[in-house]
Swiss-Prot record:
One Pfam family in the UniProt entry: NAPRTase_N
Domain of life: Bacteria
Gene: pncB
Protein's name according to its UniProt entry: Nicotinate phosphoribosyltransferase
PTM summary: Transiently phosphorylated on a His residue during the reaction cycle. Phosphorylation strongly increases the affinity for substrates and increases the rate of nicotinate D-ribonucleotide production. Dephosphorylation regenerates the low-affinity form of the enzyme, leading to product release.
The enzyme's E.C. designation: 6.3.4.21
InterPro entries: N/Namide_PRibTrfase (IPR041525), NAPRTase_N (IPR040727), Nic_PRibTrfase (IPR006406), Nic_PRibTrfase-Fam (IPR007229), Nicotinate_pribotase-like_C (IPR036068)
HAMAP family xrefs: NAPRTase
Positions where Phosphohistidine occurs in the chain: H220
Gene3D superfamilies: nicotinate phosphoribosyltransferase
Length: 400
């Protein structure tokens, strides 16, 4: 390593839980599916100057492998089957699947290959980019600065929640992808462990080492890929929901609702799906409006909302989480996943708004429409129109 003294990543499990959960489902159902994914910076940061350092880290990732103690720990979890874990034991990152270029200051990254393998790149690669950029931009920032900020926020949170029944408040760390650094995330999570309302982390490495519950089900890419895997676009979301239940019939039952839009999702989320899935996750659009729609939908189907859970994970901080808790906690179970506002909250440090999203499946376009227009991702405007038509959504003049 030259530009960065050593590899940023030290464990194959330093990733979000839903990546392994989805990878196992792909392993069992979609071995032959090929995909392409692309990096996008939603802000105005020109990150192309870091391309060489990122490429260096990508090559270092080929040396990561599942360690024996990690393998043994995974075998003790209820989610995984032996055939998948034995395959994962032999998994290695293939840097040839990753193209990293500096396009006049803009960072371009494209991932291509079997979905089974490409699925693993997104979270650790984003974490690497975030840590590299912050290392160069904010060399004076430290774990202690992050902890000082957290302690102040926790003190404010204690004041804010004084007299409030917090017995139904559950917070998870969702901060791997855009963390300031691996060390900051670990310190934050260790501190949060002291709070009775902290229930787990999406990071499998931290969950193992700190004896926490790993949290996560599926991401947008699960639904996006089914847009081309399913023979009929109009039923692709239902196909994705059904395939997930086939892999996980009675666990990991939180469904992400905004790959198309919440309204389109609820039209597909009939009584069987709503009964079998444990709850729903919010990731775009107005959270109060979304939660009200979810509760109304359960009631319409004759399902007691108190038997279900809503997971909020869109750009949350502690204050927003408490506002939502006050609004909904008497009517439905709740969990809150906070990412960047925990693991990259340091004075004078600007978090990166970066994502890697699926753009093709088996050589054909896929799209994420979402409930926030700025989060729409698709290169093919004709496919966006076809998707909106298939799901009975109004056409819009401009799609990014």
């Amino acid at each position: 390593m030259t530009q960065f003294a050593s590899p940023v990543l030290h464990s194959l499990l330093d990733t979000d839980a839903y990546k392994l959960h989805m990878q196992q489902a792909v392993f069992h159902h979609y071995h032959d599916v090929h995909v392409a994914a692309e990096f996008r910076c939603r802000g105005d940061d020109l990150l192309g100057i870091y391309a060489d350092a990122i490429r260096e880290q990508v090559h270092a990732m080929q040396h990561l492998r599942l360690q024996e103690e990690e393998f043994q720990w995974l075998t003790g979890l209820p989610f995984f089957k032996p055939d998948y874990l034995n395959w994962l034991r032999d998994f290695r990152y293939n840097p040839e699947q990753v193209s990293v270029t500096n396009d006049n200051g803009k960072l371009n990254i494209r991932l291509t290959g079997p979905w089974l393998e490409v699925i693993m790149w997104e979270v650790p690669l984003l974490a690497v980019i975030s840590e590299l950029v912050h290392h160069y931009r904010s060399p004076e920032a430290s774990v202690q600065l992050a902890m000082n900020t957290l302690e102040q926020k926790l003190a404010d949170f204690t004041t804010l929640t004084a007299g409030l029944d917090m017995s139904r408040f559950h917070l998870m760390d969702f901060g791997t992808r855009r963390r300031f650094s691996r060390d900051v995330q670990e310190a934050i999570v260790k501190r949060l462990q002291q709070e009775s309302w902290f229930v787990g982390t999406s990071n499998y490495d931290l969950a193992r080492r700190l004896s926490l519950t790993p949290m996560g089900t599926q991401a947008h890419e699960w639904f996006q890929a089914h847009q081309q895997i399913s023979p009929d676009l109009a039923t692709s979301q239902r196909a994705a929901l059904a395939a997930w239940l086939e892999e996980y019939p009675d666990q990991l039952g939180i469904a992400l609702t905004d790959c198309i839009t919440m309204d389109a999702f609820l039209r597909d989320f009939g009584v069987e799906f709503a009964s079998r899935y444990q709850g729903l996750r919010h990731d775009s659009g107005d959270p109060v409006e979304w939660g009200e729609k979810a509760i109304a939908h359960y009631l319409k189907l004759g399902i007691d909302p108190q038997s279900k859970v809503l997971v909020f994970s869109d750009n949350l901080d502690l204050t927003k989480a408490i506002e939502l808790y006050r609004h909904f906690s008497s009517r439905i179970k709740l969990s809150f996943g906070i990412g960047t506002r925990l693991t990259c909250d340091i004075p004078q440090v600007k978090p990166l708004n970066i994502v890697i999203k699926l753009v093709e499946c088996n050589g054909k376009p896929v799209a994420k429409l979402s409930d926030s227009p700025g989060k729409t991702i698709c290169h093919d405007k004709a496919f966006v129109r076809a998707l909106r038509k298939a799901f009975d959504l109004p056409q819009i003049k401009k799609a990014s």
